[in-house]
From Swiss-Prot:
Pathway: Cell wall biogenesis; peptidoglycan biosynthesis. The gene is mtgA. The lineage of its organism: Bacteria, Pseudomonadati, Pseudomonadota, Alphaproteobacteria, Hyphomicrobiales. Belongs to the glycosyltransferase 51 family. This is Biosynthetic peptidoglycan transglycosylase. It comes from Rhodopseudomonas palustris (strain TIE-1). It is found in: Cell inner membrane.
Length: 236
């Protein structure tokens, strides 16, 4: 029969180890964010697909080489206040809370920075635990990385096709048979219109809903001047 007095220290050691491992896992994304100021990071979904043998297609492209219409369209579609918030759009958060209190379907309030946090370090799907982890990560990412770099990462890790097409290059090649550097304003807006559901919406064979969204984003993208955003971000 085991001695409860002797087993108590072992139990405490196990608990300490578990706590230390949990703290290390929580700290890892914050350390990796600093390293992701450079390089070509991949998403957790890409890693999972590689691990399970599912197809993954991704070719990194620097944001300077992407057709300017695509980052403008994505900002117009996904996060109109991208240049002015600090990782979280609190107005959108309040709208989501109001929707929940009124019993209405949530419109979603994730910024591009929050989506980068989720894609790089967390998991897809709706979860309060994930949201609780995502919020401080988004604030940290916005603090550590320039806006231009955040958007560059997003454009290279977003899922843009039904068969493992990740990033703007793979998405543009799948939908239009061309490089992300060669996208027209309409093509860029069409790619933006299928986010964040490329398995449900298609840029290759867009339905009426996608075409309507794309037409809206073409107009909005003309007003999304990002050069000033990059300058202001560097000066702040």
């Amino acid at each position: 029969m085991s001695d409860p007095v002797a087993s108590a220290p072992r139990t405490k050691r196990v608990v300490r180890i578990v706590i230390l491992v949990a703290l290390a896992l929580l700290a890892l994304p914050y350390l990796l964010t600093i390293l992701y100021g450079g390089g070509q990071p991949v998403s957790t979904l890409m890693l999972w697909r590689w691990a399970t043998g599912a197809p993954v297609s991704r070719t990194w492209i620097d944001i300077e080489n992407i057709s300017p219409a695509l980052p403008r369209s994505v900002v117009a579609a996904e996060d109109a206040k991208f240049c002015s918030h600090h990782g979280i759009d609190w107005d959108s958060v309040r709208d989501v809370i109001d929707d929940m209190q009124d019993g209405e379907a949530s419109r979603g309030g994730s910024t591009i920075t929050q989506q980068v946090a989720k894609n790089l370090f967390l998991w897809p799907g709706r979860s309060m635990i994930r949201k609780a982890l995502e919020a401080p990560l988004a604030l940290w990412i916005d603090f550590v990385l320039p806006k231009q770099r955040i958007l560059e990462i997003y454009l290279n890790i977003a899922e843009w096709g039904p068969d493992g097409q990740f990033g703007a290059m793979a998405g543009a090649d799948y939908a239009f048979g061309r490089s992300a550097a060669q996208l027209s304003a309409k093509e860029a807006a069409t790619l933006a219109a299928i986010l964040p559901n490329p398995r449900v919406r298609s840029a290759k064979a867009p339905g009426p809903g996608v075409r309507r969204l794309a037409a809206t984003y073409v107009a909005r993208a003309r007003a999304a001047e990002l050069r000033q955003c990059w300058r202001e971000n560097r000066e702040s």
